[in-house]
A protein has these predicted regions:
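A short glycine-rich, Lys/Arg-flanked "PGG" loop and its adjoining helix->strand segment in the class I
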Residues: 178-193
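Class I SAM-dependent methyltransferase SAM/SAH-binding core
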Residues: 97-99, 108-155
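Short alpha-helix
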Residues: 221-237
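Short, glycine-/aromatic-enriched active-site segment of Class I SAM-dependent methyltransferases
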Residues: 199-220
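Conserved alpha-helix/loop element of class I SAM-dependent methyltransferases that forms part
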Residues: 55-60, 75-94
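A short acidic, Gly/Pro-enriched loop at the edge of an enzyme's catalytic core
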Residues: 154-166
Length: 289
């Protein structure tokens, strides 16, 4: 009688890679005023930039309240960006479920819930961000529909086909797009919508410029070429329905931020990269087929 040797199970794959661990550690300890003071204006804490024409009159008036006016205007511009992304999520019903992937401190999830009245799951690899965002959901009285979880966007563990829509707002540069879009193709129901707003380097410029490399180093990220988004979407059943170049629309935000107390030292780099054509700020919306 022969016996079969017991099967030795493989070691479980790490939840996140060593690189992602370094990113999580950064965001677990990050307390940058540019990510906090703007959210204090109305309780919607965003981790992205703004779009639209700035109201330059905020630079006028009493000097002692000048910075307060600038911060309020910067927040208005970043809220306009969040609303623009939500505009491209398509028709969302109150009983639909959305995924805010790389949710930061949760502002985008709250925007989507306020707009559609829907269920939103926000995910981040930063336990500090998740705890902060869940506290904000409670303060806004929507924690029955908006929940934040400590998860890896490359391997979420959510059920297949469980989401009507998914978005990334300036977070795709932290992951491999081939892995990311494969996971989203699994998570989205057929006909579901994916939206990203992202910085990418311009393929026609050639390789990443000095400014793009500086931004990578500043944020511990790896900015993808524009072409990579469309290549990996095509490989993973995501068909673009809308592409909007927001590069010109984000420049006023950066010019105004450079005049505020919230400067981080990266403002001139962004402005140079946008203006020399090496860096672009895009919205891409795609349907899952």
């Amino acid at each position: 009688m022969t016996t079969t040797a017991p099967r030795v199970s493989a070691a479980p794959a790490p939840t996140i890679s060593p690189y992602q661990e370094s990113v999580a550690d950064y965001w677990n300890h990050e307390k940058n005023p540019v990510n906090l003071r703007l959210g204090e204006v109305d309780g919607f804490y965003h981790h992205h930039y703004g779009i639209g024409d700035a109201d330059w009159s905020v630079l006028d008036g009493p000097e002692d309240t000048r910075d307060e006016r600038i911060i309020a205007e910067l927040h208005r511009l970043e809220c306009a960006q969040a609303d623009f992304l939500a505009d491209h999520l398509g028709a969302v019903a109150a009983d639909d479920r959305l995924l805010d992937s790389g949710c930061g401190r949760g502002g985008g999830s709250l925007v989507a819930n306020k707009r559609f009245g829907c269920h939103v799951d926000g995910i981040s690899i930063s336990k500090t961000q998740v705890a902060f965002a869940n506290e904000q959901a409670k303060k806004h009285g929507v924690d029955d529909k908006v929940r934040f979880r400590l998860k890896n966007m490359l391997d979420t563990g959510f059920e297949t086909g469980s989401f009507r829509g998914i978005w990334n707002n300036e977070s795709t540069m932290y992951v491999d797009l081939s892995l990311l879009f494969a996971e989203y193709a699994r998570l989205l129901a057929r006909g579901g919508r994916y939206v990203t707003i992202t910085g990418c380097y311009n393929d026609t410029y050639g390789l990443p410029s000095r400014e793009v490399s500086t931004i990578n180093a500043h944020y511990i990220c790896d900015i993808h070429p524009r072409s990579a988004y469309f290549k990996e979407m095509a490989n993973n059943r995501l068909v673009p329905i809308s592409v909007v170049d927001l590069t010109a629309a984000t420049i006023p935000y950066w010019e105004l931020r450079a005049k505020s107390s919230l400067v981080t030292g990266i403002e001139d780099t962004f402005l140079t990269a946008y203006k020399n054509g090496s860096f672009q700020y895009l919205l891409i919306a795609a349907d899952r087929i």
